[in-house]
Design a protein with these regions (language model features):
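Nucleotide/phosphate-binding catalytic cleft detector across ATP-hydrolyzing
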Residues: 1-119, 127-247, 254-300
Length: 300
């Protein structure tokens, strides 16, 4: 019937467990809208969760939405249209690295350079921010989802065990690492249950963080190279500020064990992980929403 029955965490619980009458949809892929109608319905669902007032007056809302800094005009237009269809009255867009910087507590209007690396699910956003604007940026479609896909592929190839996307994500959370030597911070092995790819018999496979670090190596290297390429395009004065202030990591990908150390060793600049990396973009967008007049230049 194309009627929405769940959104957000509740829908995620159903993912890969549905029958023919229920579809689970990810409206966003690679940081951009993949399914316009589903995206609009998702926004309506999320608004309903927040706005639990009387149904008589449908709220006309002011919204701030984070978008990848590498978005094309068409992609930005799609986000704006989706929000307006879902009853957004004043729709403002903010680039995700800018929102992350505000959420981390950086003074984005200061005349000094700060670099943010925001590793989300679909895209990694790297931006140098100064005087309330983005001076140089690099947006790549390599991020958390790719790490999950790497693990799925590795388990199938190396251990002959079929794992779902959700199980691969659990492996990433429990034993994911960017380094093969974590010393005292090494997590315990994680036992993966799944069917054998060939015989379909049940299997139990213990997985250690070292093998996952090997399997994620290529994708992490792509993120490393993207950071280096953004630094190459940074004006020397701002570069000096970045060396002094360090580089901030935000987004779910920042939680990958040893990522900050690996990047630091490779690039020779200190890396800091945001206090609550998963929510720094949302926090920043919330602060921007309360200060629309002050941050008017951030919105597009």
């Amino acid at each position: 019937t194309d009627k929405m029955i769940a959104v957000g965490e509740k829908a995620k619980m159903m993912y890969e467990k549905t029958h023919d009458n229920i579809r689970t949809i990810r409206p966003l892929r690679d940081g951009v809208i993949a399914d316009f109608t589903a995206c609009e319905q998702m926004m309506r669902g999320l608004i309903k969760m927040v706005h639990t007032g009387s149904r008589l007056f449908s709220p006309s809302l002011r919204m701030v939405i984070g978008v990848p800094s590498g978005s094309t005009e068409v992609e930005l237009r799609a986000v704006r249209d989706s929000a307006e269809h879902a009853d957004g009255r004043d729709v403002y867009l903010i680039f995700e690295p800018m929102a992350a910087a505000i959420g981390i507590g950086i003074d984005v209007e200061a005349p000094e350079g700060n670099m943010i690396v925001d590793i989300g699910g679909g895209s990694t956003e790297i931006a140098v921010i100064s005087l309330g604007g983005i001076v140089s940026n690099n947006s790549i479609r390599t991020a958390g989802d790719d790490l999950t896909a790497d693990i799925q592929e590795y388990m199938s190839r190396q251990h002959n065990v079929k794992v779902s996307e959700r199980m691969a994500e659990r492996i990433k959370i429990h034993v994911g690492s960017a380094l093969t030597d974590l010393g005292d911070e090494a997590p315990e092995d994680f036992v993966v249950h799944g069917p054998n790819r060939i015989t379909a018999l049940p299997m139990e496979v213990p997985v250690c963080y070292q093998e996952i670090a090997h399997c994620l190596d290529k994708t992490v290297a792509k993120i490393e190279n993207a950071v280096l390429s953004a630094l190459e395009n940074t004006p020397p004065e701002l570069y000096a500020d970045i060396v002094k202030n360090g580089i901030w990591l935000s987004g779910g990908g920042a939680l990958l064990r040893g990522l900050d150390k690996r990047l630091q060793d490779k690039i020779n600049i200190p890396f800091h992980i945001a206090e609550d990396p998963l929510h720094s973009v949302a926090k920043g967008a919330g602060i921007a929403l309360k200060n629309v007049d002050r941050f008017s230049f951030l919105m597009r």
